[in-house]
Amino acid sequence: MVMCTLCKREEAVFMRRYSGEKLCGKCFSKSIENKVRGTISKYEMLQPKDKIMVAVSGGKDSVTLLHILTKIEKAYPGTALSAVTVDEGIKGYRDEALKVAKKNCQKLGVKHVVTSFKEMYGYKLDEIVNMIREKEL
């Protein structure tokens, strides 16, 4: 069993090829959070009282970012974090992801705005594709 090179207590589940680090789940998660914190700090991306909106598709990457930003937001008094999900209007494509996004926002107490291509452009993406196909025929 290969042990985590950081905590030396847990079994490693991930290896960083560029550094040779072998990380357990907790240390891996903490290292990602620290990278996000470092980037935000280095580029002065957040100031107290900023309004932050994160795009949340419902996939693992955006949901992870939402969780990390929820933790980081606490270090910036007066900031307001909210999330937006865009429903493109592709039949059967976004349904489950919308549920995941909504569930995570509710769990974290983050305001969640859902918008759609239909609201923004007057058409669902499926309708736009059909119109383009009809013109090409």
List each model region and its residues:
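Nucleotide/phosphate-binding catalytic cleft detector across ATP-hydrolyzing
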Residues: M1
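ATP-dependent adenylation/nucleotidyltransferase module used to activate substrates
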Residues: C4-L137
